Amino acid sequence: MPADLHPDLDALAPLLGTWAGQGAGEYPTIEPFEYLEEVVFSHVGKPFLVYAQKTRAVADGTPLHAETGYLRVPKPGQVELVLAHPSGITEIEVGTYSASGGVIEMEMVTTAIGMTPTAKEVTALSRSFRMVGDELSYRLRMGAVGLPLQHHLGARLRRKS
């Protein structure tokens, strides 16, 4: 456990660090695409992890997306993800986690989505994370622009530090 990590985060301590890898996205309204991703989990000694994510195009490194926020642990086995996107969207996801035998799994669904007047309509999001050793994978499902919740993104990341 890192020094000064809040004790409520002990089970999620293996997430701390920088993760990088590749993912793929699809949605009925866009062409399928691949991306490079970096995710950083850090902490400030309070009962939440700081989360920062950014992606770029595989072909030329063009920035694609970013999001930042906090992964809160209100009580053992429960998580709350609070995120802001530069596309004008904020989201709150609530769910559960389990941590055992070197495996961490999280399942979350949105309970609230905020949008600026110019943001594209997003009505639902859900995420699944799975960390095994030095590999972190996730799936993101999205309901947007009049379509129901469905697969949108998936990636496999490896620990860099």
Curated annotation (Swiss-Prot):
Binding site for heme b: 152
One example GO MF annotation: metal ion binding
The enzyme's E.C. designation: 5.99.-.-
Assigned keywords, A-Z: Heme, Iron, Isomerase, Metal-binding
A Pfam family reported for this protein in Swiss-Prot or TrEMBL: THAP4_heme-bd
Cofactor dependence: heme b
Pathway(s) served: Nitrogen metabolism
Motif mapping: GXWXGXG: 17-23
Family: Belongs to the nitrobindin family.
Domain notes: Forms a 10-stranded antiparallel beta-barrel structure able to accommodate a hydrophobic ligand in its interior. In fact, this fold hosts the heme group, which is located in a wide surface cleft.
Quaternary structure and partners: Homodimer.
Name under which the protein is recorded: Peroxynitrite isomerase 2
Originating species: Mycobacterium ulcerans (strain Agy99)
Upper taxonomic lineage: Bacteria, Bacillati, Actinomycetota, Actinomycetes, Mycobacteriales
